[in-house]
Design a protein with these regions (language model features):
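Context-gated lysine
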Residues: 3, 13, 23-25, 70-72, ...
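M16/MPP (pitrilysin/insulinase) zinc-metallopeptidase core fold and M16-derived inactive scaffolds
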Residues: 41, 45-97
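A domain-level signal for the structural core that forms small-molecule/cofactor-binding pockets
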Residues: 62, 121-124, 155-156
Length: 158
């Protein structure tokens, strides 16, 4: 079998950042997949499932309610390796096009202090596995990275 695109990235060189993982043509539309890399693979500790789950609920809710982008959001969810998230948007975009959106999203998470949307037995299959304080920690750290975002954290290493 062929190696999938995400496994061709040198994870030993990969830093936290906001990357275009791939672009796919679906019918007449382009779908852009973003790699929202929070931790440095194989170097820094990975996120635990509880904070990943909290970030997933908060980011998905935020993005699907963001007036300029909500109609473009197809999916937001965690990477299996627990070092980040994927965001799929309808349209042909580059990292620079969405850095403000992602920064605003993670700022929202960093400042969030209410009940996590969908964190109930009725709404979620594992609602007790949430850690808002750690989600806020990772979000705050990621916002700090995006404050000075440049090509070093928006283009995959060669």
């Amino acid at each position: 079998m062929e190696k999938i695109t995400s496994f061709t990235i040198d994870h030993l060189k990969l830093q936290p950042g906001l990357y275009v993982s791939r672009k796919d043509k679906v019918g007449t539309e382009i779908v852009t997949t973003f790699d929202i890399r929070i931790t440095r693979p194989n170097i820094e500790p990975v996120m635990n499932t509880a904070e990943i789950h909290a970030i997933e609920h908060l980011a998905a809710t935020y993005l699907r309610n963001y007036p300029l982008w909500k109609e473009k959001v197809l999916y937001f969810g965690p990477m299996g390796c627990r070092t980040g998230f994927y965001l799929l948007l309808a349209g042909d975009y580059e990292s620079a096009d969405v850095v403000k959106l992602i920064k605003d999203c993670f700022q929202f998470i960093a400042e969030f202090s209410r009940e996590i949307p969908g964190a109930s037995a009725k709404d979620c299959g594992n609602y007790l596995d949430m850690n808002l304080p750690m989600a806020k920690y990772w979000a705050h750290r990621y916002v700090a990275l995006l404050e000075n975002a440049d090509n070093s954290c928006m283009l995959y290493p060669v």
